[in-house]
Curated annotation (Swiss-Prot):
Role description: Pyrophosphatase that hydrolyzes non-canonical purine nucleotides such as inosine triphosphate (ITP), deoxyinosine triphosphate (dITP) or xanthosine 5'-triphosphate (XTP) to their respective monophosphate derivatives. The enzyme does not distinguish between the deoxy- and ribose forms. Probably excludes non-canonical purines from RNA and DNA precursor pools, thus preventing their incorporation into RNA and DNA and avoiding chromosomal lesions.
Cofactor notes: Binds 1 divalent metal cation per subunit; can use either Mg(2+) or Mn(2+).
Organism name: Chaetomium globosum (strain ATCC 6205 / CBS 148.51 / DSM 1962 / NBRC 6347 / NRRL 1970) (Soil fungus)
Protein name: Inosine triphosphate pyrophosphatase
Family: Belongs to the HAM1 NTPase family.
Length: 191
């Protein structure tokens, strides 16, 4: 039996990151049911869009159903967009302090958090991209350091890590991209 809050659509979010999964579910559900699968997908090198589209196509083929994949960038304006789509590896190698040190010689600490989701209805369906951007700046780590670079990305006086999760989920780059996905589902997938 369908209830007013029952999900009308279902996607398999391809991630092994429980923090990302929690955020995506908090933003999309109950309108879109979010299941999770962990696939070891090799990421090509390229632009954020190329990486996300490639991951989505391969995930749709493996899952044989509707998939949602995500790729995130942290772009330092002083470094012409670096680390960009390679933030995961920069973060693993350098940590919060090392990322701050990359900007030590620059007055400009501004940055963009960019999130790109790709949705595919399944094998053979061309993925659709949804991108969200939040402008902020890089600061010394503040708040819990347990979710990537959240502790060094400041938006309007608070780092993502200092924010209440519900507040972050209303302004983040991930939220902005998922809002576009929700809008698309509402228009394109309406009964």
């Amino acid at each position: 039996m369908t209830t007013p809050t029952a999900a009308r659509h279902m996607v398999n979010f391809i991630t092994g990151n429980t923090n990302k999964l929690c955020e995506v579910r908090a933003i999309l559900q109950p309108a879109i049911q979010v299941e999770s699968q962990t696939l070891d997908l090799i990421e090509i090198q390229g632009t954020l869009e190329e990486v996300t589209l490639d991951k989505c196509r391969r995930a749709a083929d493996l899952v044989e159903g509707p998939v949602l994949v995500e790729d995130t960038c942290l772009c330092f304006n002083a470094l012409n967009g670096l680390p960009g789509p390679y933030i995961k590896w920069f973060m693993k190698s350098l940590g919060h302090t090392g990322l701050n040190n990359l900007l030590a010689a620059y007055e400009d600490k501004s940055a963009q958090a960019v999130c790109t989701f790709a949705y595919s209805a399944g094998p053979g369906h061309e993925p659709i991209l949804f991108q969200g951007i939040t402008d902020g700046k890089i600061v010394p780590a503040r708040g819990p350091g347990d979710f990537g670079w959240d502790a060094i990305f400041e938006y309007e006086g608070q780092t993502y890590a200092e924010m209440d999760k519900a507040a972050k989920n209303k302004i983040s780059h991930r939220y902005r991209a998922l809002a576009k996905l929700q809008e698309w589902f509402a228009k394109e997938m309406a009964p």
